Amino acid sequence: MAKFNGLRPYLAMALVVIALFALAPPAAAQSGGPPDYRQYFGADSRLVIWVVAQLHLLFAAFVLGVPIFALITEFVGHRTGEKRFDKLAHDFTKLLAASFSTTAAFGGLLAFSLFALYPTFMSHLSDIFTPTYAWYGILFFAEAFTMYFYLYSWDWLAGQRKKWHLWTGLLLNIFGVAIMLIANSWVSFMMTPPLAQVNEETGEVIRQGLNVLSLEWTGTLWQAINNPLWSPLNIHRFIGNVAFGGFIVGAYAAVRFLNARTREARAYYDWMGYIGNFIGVAALIPMPFAGYYMGREVYSYSAVMGNNMMGGAFSWTFIIQAILIGALFIGANFYLWSGMSRIPGSERYLKYIKWLDVVLILCFAIWLTPHNLPLSPEEQVIMGGQFHPTLKFLGLMAAKNAVINFIIIATFLSFLLYRRGNKGERVPVSQQGVSSKIVVLAGFVVVALVLGWYAFRLFTLNPAELDLSPNKAVYFTLPAVLLVAQILAGAVAVALTLKDRGVTGQMIYVAVTVLNSVLILGPYGFTVMTQANPFLRNIAVAQWLITMSGLVFITAIDIVLLRGAEEIGAIRWGQMTERSQYALILLVVGVVMLMSLMGYIRSGLREDWHVFGVLRDTSASALTPSMAYMARVIAGIVAAFIALVAFVFWLAGLGESGEVEPGTMFPLRAAPQPSASQTITEPAGAGGND
């Protein structure tokens, strides 16, 4: 097994070298050119690319996400001196190394398949992006060497040299993110290519870009990279990759927990599963907003593509997406609630769980309610039309925006209850010193500046920017006023916290957050939809800022409130129910399904275009699959990925016992040190684990 591990870097390097040679334009292009399309043994070329690309992206998401929190965890271990954090970061990196060569293999297969099956399209793309291919290869080499050095130098760069190991981890993350940015430029260009604009009368070029008629690119490489969808896709994928990596780690820890045979191992893998779930949920919380930003840019570029996304052939895929997102939030909350059983004193807060559960279920029901239903003519007559007279309103974006904010707030409150479970008497803020007051004030200042900036933006917004008449400016006032009210509520919370009434301040700020973001701006969104529809996107931004301000500011207060608080008892790591571990495993199944579905939506929105609106796909498979066909393909991808991950992790674990060294989770009792006049009466070896 050690020999196999040593060969991994060389296998990955070989695949990249071969792929780079494959990226060179084929010689046949110089003599008549290659055919537009080819097939592998008669297989559907689009299906081949779909499956290979999605499997590559899933592994790549894990490879990008894991180094981020591995570095953070290692840094925490370095600063605190706790052995368990360093071991956790090392275990994260072992999982990364096990997946890296598989990612490279699928990447090489994808490159071969694209150039073999779609030579004309890839030739067109290469005319624009050839320099990025070289940079991609160089960065991949750099990432591979850095990753294996980061793994194998763990013990060598320990102690006084630890800072150099941390710098290596930072470099690894920089290379990984840079690779993602380059790859995102290719796929985002296919959806939103910057088009050249020419004055029809004078022939003067107004804007450089892609010529629709000649397919000639007249812009710069940076213009092609920085296309309208590039930044939203970068944000969405980066956050998604972190969430994905966290849930994968959580599932891995759950399997290890279920097979652990010692108390130390069960405690360690229980803690590892908690960290993985925490990372997944923390990244999952901003995901809906990142997705909304991306969808907004799709609409801005092409109303046709945007309407098709939410109201056309792809509308029902978003109902499936809603089900999966809701299931992830409910599963993550269930795990947190189950975890309270291992926290002494948490029974004080169990009475609140049922109310959070009610909020989550009701919001989930609204979140997945469709606007229109696939009805027969007879059913439409019975119901009085295509839309349900009442439930149709729950299918609109105004309702969706409100409930997703409520789901996020409820999830955040679950974590606050979990965090507060074993805390007893608190140290008054007035007795904590200057640093605590700085934390509270700094949190408030950051929140106030962001909310104040957007409130000013809404107060001064010109309706013409949204293609609205001047009289529509009246609809801009309410959200701006609510943003100011949120700032004032923050000031009240600060004053109460400094007066040792921080819990009351938190409750007030949570109540105002729910009131403004959900109960006022939610229904107000329906008015905006009918009277000033383009402004609905600004309503969504205001809701998001209010919700995120609540999360950030309440966390700042909570850190101060619990600083130095008495503990009712230590968390009993390892004393966790088995069903909670199955929840972690189901979470990873759900997130793999969600990422596969969203990959299909993003790519499928182009329909029969290789490059939307410019280069049409004229192959036999240039069609939008049915929902049933899409579901079968995604189910196959999910099953294949989970099987591959299980196999890769099993292979990487050969030769390892899976047990945890004593002292990792539970400190060893130190033997008493006798003075010069004392003798040791305790027999040797009497010290053991707590």
What are these regions (language model features)?
Residues M1-A29:
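N-terminal secretory/membrane targeting signals
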Residues A12-F21, A97-G107, L170-P194, F278-G291, ...:
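Hydrophobic alpha-helical membrane-insertion segments
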Residues A19, L64-F69, F100-F121, A134-K163, ...:
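Transmembrane-helix bundle segments that line or gate the permeation/cavity pathway
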Residues F21-V51, G687-D690:
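Short, strongly hydrophobic alpha-helical membrane anchors
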Residues Q30, S99-G169, S188, A290-G306, ...:
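Membrane-interface helix-loop-helix modules in multi-pass inner-membrane proteins
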Residues R46-L57, H124-I138, G203-V212, T218-G240, ...:
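Short aromatic-rich membrane-water interface segments that cap or initiate transmembrane helices
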Residues I68-K94, F112-H124, F149-H165, V249-I275, ...:
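Juxtamembrane membrane-water interface segments of multi-pass membrane proteins
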Residues H371-P389, V450-A480, V512-V552, I559, ...:
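Membrane-proximal extracellular juxtamembrane segment immediately upstream
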